């Protein structure tokens, strides 16, 4: 159980974003596809064919929908559809070969009776009679003439719901769409010198290859995909299609597009990834024959290597997912060898390696697209680990091997002891290899996978070579640097302190008798179980208890409003009173009847275990569950106190009372306070004041002078259940005046009744307070 609590406390010290990886695992088959960006823009439209990055061949993969592009005049490539997306009525597009074909398209809104309108076509004002009898659909009309001074005639109208239109140069003709959606078809106009026809688009447009004409027709009839209709899709200049690519180098920084403030930079990098596994081998308390777990842990590794003559400093974090749990039980006797859980990674597991280096590619990694990578495979083999028993031959876990194969790359954040870094997460799928692993001198043999006992074998690190490519949006001025999204300091000293505490506990447990081992097992989180077998520590314990009592006599706890029950002894239920406004800074106890502690200690008690259990009855840390389902409300302050103890390498007579007082004063960071009379006046945490009637919970005008008098003459109460929660409770369930008054003063018995009834309103309020206290 102690190990469970250690793990729960450690869980609160780390934040891991795995949702994207979990959703992707096993959902697609990974294939290596060679990709060279061709002369087109890639603007956040899916699907995208990912590949290993830039390689030295001529293969080109085109997107189905290239764009959107900004309105412009240019010579469209032959055999490519221009998919136009106008937003308003008027001229949509015009084009001419300046010889025998002038062609323009106009858009007419629904429900337009025959009317004469003026349009500007090829720089001239033209009067055109138009109409649209449809009540819901927009109408595209082609206007065509064959001489510069000729009159325009109307052709090939298209009635459209999605308001999209297409035009293409192909085979000596200009193709357009006509008919009515969702059954529109293509038509064409013959022209000479069709390849020299310049087009002027007056709206955003896309470019679709002729090979995808069926998809273009689908868009014309049914509209663009939802992703293209969001504010996140921004049109770019048509010049972004003209990208010059050079042969790959170990370091490449290529300007993809550039505006006055921002530019897109493509970074291509050859990289060397070095990583190692970390593990945690935890020995259970007892005589030394049992291990509670052998597990994987995230491992940080920092190194340098040379890339294109430049020394690069890199940092990797290796973690695993999809772990398989095994166990071995040699028997029920205290001297039987037992491993409660040992972890193994196999073909259903994944390895994540977060990579960061000090190159320019990682300095502005905020907005990234077109991310791809190609990495080699690597084999990881297990070494030998001996389980040191007090007596007898040591069991040895040996062997095991897996190979890692690249399965994708995403953005990530990796945490070091000092800072978090925006990095690339390379995901690897696993396949099992020879040899299998076994535990010598046990019946465990012939199992495949890599166990956590010694995953690095005798190697300092494993190494993978590869290459990645990405396009990042960065400031045009290189002197500006965008901030890293996550820039926080990360502390991992809690784990080290817990490890020291665990070792001390295990060493102690092996020195005392079996009867006291049983007592320790019954009190796994009792702070005195650390030293319950050593008689000399009892005096220190009594001194601590005495100091606790003295310390609390000096604090504001002496004037407690209500008594605490055993079930809520460690929760924030002892509400303090005070005679001044300064008492609003508060007081609620995390302990029960502290003043009675010393009276329960009998100096003449002959048994060490009796003395320890006597103290333990008053100073007991209850188990703190980290999940909200079935959450134990008995101990809000346990985690606070436990952390303080864990961070202390030594406990002296002054440590415990200081911790207790601090926990009692500060374990709820955000509180509301109220003053009680015939009216109830509440001061919220942002300094705003409200007044309510107790019977009806109706808000009444706030009397500042009366509030000042009440603060001076009546008790100020720290609110566990605020008025918003009370009013919600009264509106939905109905509560009596006495229940309201009991809740106003946070009576622990009434709180417990509502909690036992699984009342969601009270439960949610207390859960929110507990969330404020998360470590």
Swiss-Prot record:
Residue segments, region Spike body and stalk (antigen domain): 248-479
Pfam family, one: VP4_haemagglut
Other comments on record: In group A rotaviruses, VP4 defines the P serotype.
GO cellular component: host cell endoplasmic reticulum-Golgi intermediate compartment; host cell plasma membrane; host cell rough endoplasmic reticulum; host cytoskeleton; membrane; viral outer capsid
Protein name in UniProt: Outer capsid protein VP4
Span of the annotated motif YGL motif: 448-450
Motif DGE motif, chain ranges: 308-310
